[in-house]
Amino acid sequence: MQQKILILDFGSQYTQLIARRIREANVYCELHSWDVSDAFIREFNPAGVILSGGPNSVYEDETPRAPQSVFELGVPVLGICYGMQTMAAQLGGSVENAAKREFGYAEIRAQGHSALLKGIQDKSNAEGHGLLDVWMSHGDKVTALPEGFKIIASNSATPIAGMADENRRFYAVQFHPEVTHTKQGKALLNRFVHDICGCDQSWNMPDYVETAVQRIREEVGCDEVILGLSGGVDSSVAAALIHRAIGDQLTCVFVDNGLLRLNEAEQVMETFGKNLGVKVIHVDASAKFLGDLSGVNDPEAKRKIIGREFVEVFQQEAAKLPQAKWLAQGTIYPDVIESAGAKTKKAHTIKSHHNVGGLPDTLKLKLLEPLRELFKDEVRELGIALGLPHDMVYRHPFPGPGLGVRILGEVKREYADLLRQADHIFIEELRSTKDADGKSWYDKTSQAFAVFLPVKSVGVMGDGRTYDYVVALRAVVTTDFMTAHWAELPYDLLGKVSNRIINEVRGINRVVYDISGKPPATIEWE
């Protein structure tokens, strides 16, 4: 019988990161809403249960609670943030609003020699106590322990930052071990699933491919599927996976919306149509997209328009395929969670995505999203397992709305043409510039692109005054795209990119570099 971990989702923005960390530990896990039935939990038969964080307060009326059967199964349970608070409240402890909230980095002291934290530390203090650098995000705190529990972590702001009932193997932490900012978070989760729950390392990507292929075949049957192919990593891997499952039942639709990267249409048709043998229909809808975007400044409105146009094009192409019943998309989990599209519908909305927002009620095709619960690094790993070329799989992500969300405000063909050229120069220089170990800066960064700013600045070229547009460069380093650090590119590289853009792209006379992290900023500007 396969060992597996059940994650109950209370609506945190970070919930799927828990699943990602468990999968990295080669343990199978599934994420389900907090309100699943007791019968489901018993049938699932987990080796352990993790309660996620969430935006609610346990002392308010009608807030989520873990099914009571979770605490009656006799298996280990780990509560994280809100998961700790609901565990405490449900088992007889107390939770109150914190006078001092904690958001961001914090240092906690491990204590009590718990099975969860023993030997896990970043450093120690003068007394020899283990200290951990962690990521906090809470406005409430546990103020009284349930019977049988002891404190296993604390700091001055949160005296009960961790608790444990060793006899029942119930553990909880107020911080978020699933985010990369908690340096020992992976070690903590590995300790829980391997040592405390007793799971072995039996789950891997080849197994996932086999499972996903079988699931697609069962879901689709003999129907035909159309997929919106952008040439980006997500849609490319989705196409390869679906093609592996159903072959020529898949038809890819490549839509040129006028918002693509330089020479992208030609590259996509060459790669998929000729090299991979996938059926691809090329639709040039650039005039329609740009026309509908004329005069629209609001980023959410732009995303909705772009999403609507994509769906309309797919519907038109589907009408030419009488057996087409499914619209496939390369939606991945960060798309879903940033649109509050998680299963609980509790996560706070940050921005909508064309894959998960903007789909009209009149859509006559069923949605097939085989990558919906995978993170970007898992999608890349899946692509390699499917035999896709390395350069394709490790290409930087490109948003579904394309340059439409990299042009601030109104989208015009002139702006798109300028941005295309600037972005191409930036990526070209990142690819050709190597560090001391011979690795390109393109490979060292997770995502890099240019952003068009619809403002003009004064400049001088030769003996003449210029009054032209501004471009911002954005490059980040991340493992999961839920949090990210700005990339510390060499000054000489930035200088060369700036010089080339200003000299080669007529209409741009100033280049700036974005040094914002995520959070507080998102990776894309819109």
UniProtKB/Swiss-Prot annotation:
Matching InterPro entries: Class_I_gatase-like, GATASE, GMP_synth_C, GMP_synth_GATase, GMP_synthase, GMPS_ATP_PPase_dom, NAD/GMP_synthase, Rossmann-like_a/b/a_fold
Record key words, sorted: ATP-binding, Glutamine amidotransferase, GMP biosynthesis, Ligase, Nucleotide-binding, Purine biosynthesis
Gene Ontology molecular function, alphabetical: ATP binding; GMP synthase activity
Positions contributing to ATP binding: S230, G231, G232, V233, D234, S235, S236
Record's catalysed reaction(s): XMP + L-glutamine + ATP + H2O = GMP + L-glutamate + AMP + diphosphate + 2 H(+)
Alphabetical list of NCBIfam families matching this protein: guaA_Cterm (TIGR00884), guaA_Nterm (TIGR00888), PRK00074.1 (NF000848)
Protein name, entry field: GMP synthase [glutamine-hydrolyzing]
Native species: Methylobacillus flagellatus (strain ATCC 51484 / DSM 6875 / VKM B-1610 / KT)
